[in-house]
């Protein structure tokens, strides 16, 4: 299991002093088995499954608890905002809202300190050429820590991406959120002047911005660390390079589908997005398009982050 060491001064925390200390686990306890469609990785306290068809996790069990209610996804879509009213048609024409991940080859290498799983994949949609070429590498340690390294090449004939990241559908009991980034209100690359960088705590309910017309909301920009937990267990996402996250009871599909806020129906999960980047919000409902420096127009990029499920001991 992983235990936490915190360094707190008042309400602020030195993230670099926050360390996750694994109990001694010898690598011989890590078992890796695969068949035509799945890779099963099992340690003393965890059991993970990766689908070879997507290169993504379908099961993430730690200390006997399943963290994922539904399979993990690569995510390039967001529920269009009022300011996306014009670019939305370009995104829809590119079928970004219907995109999914398809893996072609997978290599499994077991070493001294864990297992490394590398897949070559694409983000695709029906009737259009490949949107993204992706190399996904997972490194899983014997204590259950997961390091992700996702290298992406975008077809530059496609429009700017709404976002790129990983979407997880977590156990709904993981309702307490602690993060180090821009807060306490929602923040985006071009919408954070009223926010400040610091350590914040909230419940998932608190992170939802209740716009009358449902749309993308509640993201937090420039984060180094986010933790979702309850009184007994949790999961951490962290990265050396700042990222954005979103934790919500509503899927992007639900936010897009409904016309009024009172029509929204909660998911059976905490929808947890860990994002490399999102396109800027802009003001194009009544003003200019997103400024060039806030457009997510990268053609080559690499997203590295760490996931650590844990129990409180």
Question: What are the functions of these language-model segments?
Answer:
Residues 2-10, 14-15:
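Single conserved hydrophobic/aromatic residue that forms the stacking wall/gate
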Residues 18-313:
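Beta-strand/loop-rich accessory regions of lumenal/periplasmic or secreted enzymes
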């Amino acid at each position: 299991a992983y235990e936490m060491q915190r360094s707190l001064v008042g309400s602020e925390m030195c993230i670099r002093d926050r360390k996750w200390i694994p109990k001694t686990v010898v690598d011989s306890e890590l078992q890796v088995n695969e068949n035509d469609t799945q890779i099963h990785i099992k340690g003393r306290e965890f059991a993970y499954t990766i689908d070879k068809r997507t290169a993504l996790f379908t099961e993430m069990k730690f200390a006997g608890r399943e963290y994922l209610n539904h399979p993990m996804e690569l995510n390039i879509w967001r529920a269009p905002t009022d300011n996306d009213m014009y670019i939305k048609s370009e995104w829809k024409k590119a079928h970004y809202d219907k995109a999914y991940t398809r893996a072609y080859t997978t290599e499994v290498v077991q070493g001294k300190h864990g297992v490394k799983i590398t897949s070559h994949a694409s983000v695709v949609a029906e009737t259009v050429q490949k949107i993204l070429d992706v190399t996904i590498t997972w490194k899983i340690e014997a204590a259950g820590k997961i390091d992700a390294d996702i290298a992406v090449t975008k077809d530059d004939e496609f429009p700017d991406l709404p976002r790129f990241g990983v979407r997880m559908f977590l156990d709904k009991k993981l309702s307490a959120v602690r993060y180090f980034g821009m807060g306490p209100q929602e923040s985006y690359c071009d919408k954070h002047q009223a926010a400040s960088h610091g350590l914040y705590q909230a419940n998932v309910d608190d992170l939802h911005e209740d716009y009358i017309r449902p749309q993308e909301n509640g993201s937090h920009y420039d984060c180094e660390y986010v933790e979702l937990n309850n009184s007994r267990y949790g999961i951490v996402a962290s990265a050396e390079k700042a990222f954005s996250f979103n934790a919500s009871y509503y899927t992007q599909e639900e936010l897009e589908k409904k016309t009024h806020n009172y029509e929204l129906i909660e998911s059976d999960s905490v929808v947890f997005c860990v994002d490399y980047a999102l396109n800027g919000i802009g003001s194009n409902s009544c003003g200019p398009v997103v400024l060039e420096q806030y457009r997510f127009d990268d053609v080559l990029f690499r997203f590295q982050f760490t996931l650590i499920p844990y129990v409180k001991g």
